[in-house]
Amino acid sequence: MRLSQLLVPTLREIPAEAEIPSHILMLKAALMRKLASGVYIYLPLGQRVLRKVEQIVREEMDRAGSQEVLMSALIPAELLKESGRWDVFGPEMFKLKDRNERDFCLGPTHEEVFTDLIRNEVKSYRQLPLILYQIQTKFRDERRPRFGVMRSREFIMKDAYSFDMDWEGLDKSFNKMYEAYCRIFDRCGLKYLVVEADSGAMGGKDSKEFMVISGVGEAVIAYCDNCGYAANEEKAECLINQEIVEEMLPKEEVYTPNVRTIEELVNFLGITPNKFVKTLIYKAKDNVVAALVRGDRDLNETKLLNILGIREEELELADASIVEKVTGAKVGFAGPIGLKGEVMIIVDNEIPQMRNFIVGANETDYHIKNVNYGRDFKADVVADIKNVIEGDKCPRCGSPLKIDRGIEVGHIFKLGTKYSDALGAKYVDEEGNEKPIIMGCYGIGINRTVAAIIEQHHDEKGIIWPMSVAPYHVIIVPVNVSNEAQNRVAEDIYAALQKEGIEVLIDDRDLRAGVKFNDADLLGIPIRITVGKKVDDGIVEIKLRENEEAEEVKISDVVEKVKNIIKEKM
C-alpha cells in the first residue's frame, strides 16, 4: 500500500480527551476517531489491527474444536426475562421498543441467545459436547466511558459457550479454552496473569480473568511470586493471623471531640490505624447493614454484595439521617455496640482475631477502646469483606502478596446449569433420562486487547507493534522521492516484498525524511527499510522499530533478510 493513498491522518498534538498512552496513540496514529462518548470509528490501520487480533482468536478457537456462529445483536426481552436478567443489568443495558411496542435490547452479552439456540437444536447426548463462539459488537451504556476503548459503550467481543453432559465434560471444555486463551495472548505479544475472579452478573463459578499488567489498568490484582497465586481485588484473600497473645482489657469510653476519620483518630490518640475497626453503615435494598473492617483497610463492596445477594445499584452508603437513626450519633461515630433497630452486622473475618481495638461509641464525640469481638458484640455474618493490601500473606503459601494494576482482556468461567435450568436447555442421556446441559462461558475483548497491546508496546515516539498484529510488517522510506535511484530501488523492493506476500507500506510522499521517520515510528511498523544516499553503493538500511540501531544490508539481500525477521518475530 502506498502511504500517499492511505487514509492515515496522523496527529502531532495530544488530543485533549485522551488520558492514557493507548488512547493517545490510537488517535495520534489514526487508528480510530471518536464519534460520540464511548463510541469510536476505526480507520484503515485500526481495522487491520482488529482483523489481525480476530484472526489469531479464530485460529486458536478453531484449533480448540470450537465452531463459529453469528448471533443477533438485537435480543427480545422475553429471553432475558426468562433468565431473570432483564432487570439485573439495570441502566447499563440499552433497551428499546419496536413499532409494535415489543421490548428489545442491544446485546451486552449473549448467554440467553446461545442457550435458546441449544434448547431448540440439541436434544441428544450424541450432539454433545459442543463449543460455539462468535465475534460480534456488544453494547453497554457505561455510566462514565473513559480511557478510549478500555471502557466504551460499543465494543467487539469474542464470546464462546460450551455445552456438556456433565461437570467432568465442562472441566475438559474449560481447560481447552484456558489453553486456547494462553496461546491467543502469547501470540498477541502480551505479558499477562491469570487471576481468580468474581463472575458478576454473568453468574457461575470457577471464574478466571486474563489480566495484562499495566499501570493504567482499572483492575487491582494481588499475586504471589512464590507460588503463583493471583486474584483480582474482588476475589483476593489473605491468611489471617490466628495467634492471639494479648489479654482482653476492660473496655473504656474515650472522649474524641469532632474526631471522625481514622486519620484524625490516629493523630488524636497516637495509635496505629490497624488498632481501629471502622463501621460503615449501608442501605441494602430496604435493609440497613453495618459492615466492619480494620481501620487501615478498605471494604470490598463486591464481596459485600455477594454475601447480601443483591445487585450493585441496590447497595449504597447510608445518608446522614439513616446513620443518626441507627447509631443515635452524628456521622463519624458509628460502632457495633448498641445499634438501634434492625441492623444486620457483617464483620470481616480478621476482626475476631484482633484484641482491644477501638470502635465508634454510637455517641457523638465518643469512641470505645479495648473492644473485643465475642465479648462486647457479635455479628450476623463473619466473612471476608476486605481488600487485601501489599504485604498480606498469600492464602496458599504464606509469602507476602504483591499488588499491581491490570487490564482485563479475557474472562472464562463455569456457568453450570444457571441458564440451562432457567431456559430449559436439556438433553436425553443414553438411558433415556432428561438432564440439564452444563455450560461454560468464555469472553475476549478484541478492542481492549488492541489497547492492552499498545499499553505494553510503546515508547515516547509511538506504537511498537508485535509482528503478529501489526497493520503492516514493513514500511519502505525513500529519503528523497525526487532522487531517481532511490525511488527506483524503493519501488523494486516494494514490488519484491509484495510478490512474497509480505504486508508492506511504501512512504512515497514528497516530504522531509524526518517527517517520514517520525510517522513510521508513530505508526509502529515493525521493520523500516530506509533507501538513502548509499543506494549507489548497493546498500539500504533495515531498522527494527523495537531497536535503536539500524543495520546496513545489500539490496540483493533485503527480501531474504526481511523474510527471516518476520519468520523469527511471528
UniProtKB/Swiss-Prot annotation:
Subunit description: Homodimer.
Keywords: Aminoacyl-tRNA synthetase, ATP-binding, Cytoplasm, Ligase, Nucleotide-binding, Protein biosynthesis
Gene: proS
CDD domains for the chain: ProRS-INS (cd04334), ProRS_anticodon_short (cd00861), ProRS_core_prok (cd00779)
Entry annotated with the keyword Ligase: yes
Species: Thermoanaerobacter pseudethanolicus (strain ATCC 33223 / 39E)
EC number: 6.1.1.15
Domain notes: Consists of three domains: the N-terminal catalytic domain, the editing domain and the C-terminal anticodon-binding domain.
Record's protein name: Proline--tRNA ligase
Subcellular localization: Cytoplasm
Pfam family, one: tRNA-synt_2b
